[in-house]
Each structure stands twice: as structure tokens, then as C-alpha cells.
Amino acid sequence: MVESIARVRHIRVTPQKARRVVDMIRGKQAEEALAILKFAPQGASEPIYKLVASAMANARVKADASNSFLAEQDLYIAKAFVDEGTTLKRFQPRAQGRAFRINKRTSHITVVLATPDEADVATTAKKASK
């Protein structure tokens, strides 16, 4: 089983909005996920698209380094999650000398691609036959 990881940190997308996009692609084939992200209207879909493409390239390089064959159509998104990054705190001037705080949130996004094991394929086939 080939596994590759790609991370992006301090991306200027709120974690809540990024999680909506990541939930759409979790568990899907990598190429199907790229197609979903390409046409998704959410703003967070562009950095996540680049991240999935980077994870695919990482898998390709890892397979080349170990002299093993990698079928890119077998890659699927094994794990994908969004963690909260640092928050930039800004102030908005308001009436009568007040100031309201604006939180500009950032995200840490992680995508793990994997190829299914023979054991995974067998258990999936068993579940499908029941």
C-alpha cells in the first residue's frame, strides 16, 4: 500500500468553510475528487484542489523512488481533515471611539492518499456481496 501525505498550513480560509469542501471528497478516488473540486463553487476548493494534486505528485515520486508501479486511478483519499490555524486579530473602528474585533481565521489542511490493500479490496467485496 502506497501512502502519500500533503499538507498546507496557515491558509487564509476559515476552518468551517474548508471542512465543508473536505467533507465532499473524503473517501473518494483521487481523480474523482479533483473533478469535484474543479467545479465546486466554494472558495476553499481551489487550495484543496492544489493540495490533492500535490498529494498525487508525492505518491508518484514516492513510487518512483522505491521502483514500484503506481496506478494513479487506484489512489483514493484515505484521510482528509482541517485543523484550526492561527487567528489574525484585527480591529474595526466603530462609533463613539469603540472598536470591534475581527478574527481572520486560518486553516491547516491535510490530505492522505493511499492505494487499497488486497485485504481492503477483499473486505469491500464481501460487504458488497452481502
Curated annotation (Swiss-Prot):
Alphabetically ordered keywords of this record: Ribonucleoprotein, Ribosomal protein, RNA-binding, rRNA-binding
Its job: This protein binds specifically to 23S rRNA; its binding is stimulated by other ribosomal proteins, e.g. L4, L17, and L20. It is important during the early stages of 50S assembly. It makes multiple contacts with different domains of the 23S rRNA in the assembled 50S subunit and ribosome.
Lineage: Bacteria, Bacillati, Actinomycetota, Actinomycetes, Micrococcales
Family under the similarity heading: Belongs to the universal ribosomal protein uL22 family.
Self-association and partners: Part of the 50S ribosomal subunit.
NCBIfam families referenced in this protein's UniProt entry, alphabetically: rplV_bact (TIGR01044)
An example Gene Ontology biological process: translation
One Pfam family, short name: Ribosomal_L22
PANTHER family: CHLOROPLAST 50S RIBOSOMAL PROTEIN L22-RELATED (PTHR13501), LARGE RIBOSOMAL SUBUNIT PROTEIN UL22M (PTHR13501:SF8)
Record's protein name: Large ribosomal subunit protein uL22
UniProt GO MF annotations: rRNA binding; structural constituent of ribosome
Gene giving rise to this polypeptide: rplV
InterPro entries referenced in this protein's UniProt entry, alphabetically: Ribosomal_uL22, Ribosomal_uL22_bac/chlpt-type, Ribosomal_uL22_bac/org-type, Ribosomal_uL22_CS, Ribosomal_uL22_sf
GO cellular component: cytosolic large ribosomal subunit
